[in-house]
Amino acid sequence: MYKRFYWYRSGVTNTMKQALKDIYDSSMKLSFLKKGDTILDIGANDGTLLKYFKLKGYKTIGCEPAKNLTKELKKNCDYVLSDFWNYKNLNNILIKNKIDKPKLITAIGMFYDLEDPSKFISDAAQALDKDGVFIAQLMCLEDMIKKNDLGNICHEHLEFYSYKSLRYLFEKNGLKIFKIEKNNINGGSYRVYCNKRNKYSIKVNEKTSLQDVRKFISRVEKNKTKCLKFLDWCKKNNKEVFIYGASTKGNTLLQYYNINSEKIKFASERSPEKWGKYTIGSGIKIISEKEARKKNPDYFFVMPYGFIKEFIKREKKWLKGGGNFILPYPNFKILN
């Protein structure tokens, strides 16, 4: 699906760096790790998470198939598995380098991209030390629906998980969920802690019905109507609107709303790899944040809304000068 190239880098935003640091801190609070233990991060991206462990003397392995991220990942961990996850490839590294099985395995923000989630978890369980912990963080269905997060419905996301479905998958493959936390990452995520020792998974009350899905669709339509009405007003009144953050998930909204370069000319983006390219299906040119600020639009249309607090700090000068953020969801609003 990714053809060994992945656009997103974990270290681009301070919000995500802090979120990954929080996973490190949470792991330390469990007090089961010893210096020199092996840590494996599956879907390691640029190694932002593993860097925290490496600095404290743990042996770190990053599993990441995207070739464009390998150089940065190698700086932040001890060993790199440049392939899609499976136990066989990991075991080759363990044997070759005489490394113990991982005491901690993490899989952050990639559980919804799996073609075979059960096989993925089975291999992780096989790789995990008998006294180890597996931590997965992923967006949850309940918050996606509550927050009208249309962007989650994109080509990369093959699954949407309830707690019940997660518990089934982990238990089927010999892991029990002993702790679960919710946070605001990516609009709302579960952080799930599993091990082999517990007899049962904890219970979580979660209520998402078909009626909730129907209400979600209705709210999405209302957001769409309000948004398009406002963009039409901007065009009639010669107000310039740029996208802020040319995110993958944002393409779902752009295409569903039928927003193209006639309504929005440019998309401001921090990652240099995207500059000069165009948003898929909508044909909006992607430019750097620096270039976008020079053009000084009246409005920035925020795609990755989960980072809005960071964006407000970053664009303080522009906001004080009269700029406004457009938030398409959870509920359409103008922020100034």
Name these PLM-found stretches.
Residues 118-133, 316:
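A short glycine-rich, Lys/Arg-flanked "PGG" loop and its adjoining helix->strand segment in the class I
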Residues 51-89, 266, 272-275:
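Class I SAM-dependent methyltransferase SAM/SAH-binding core
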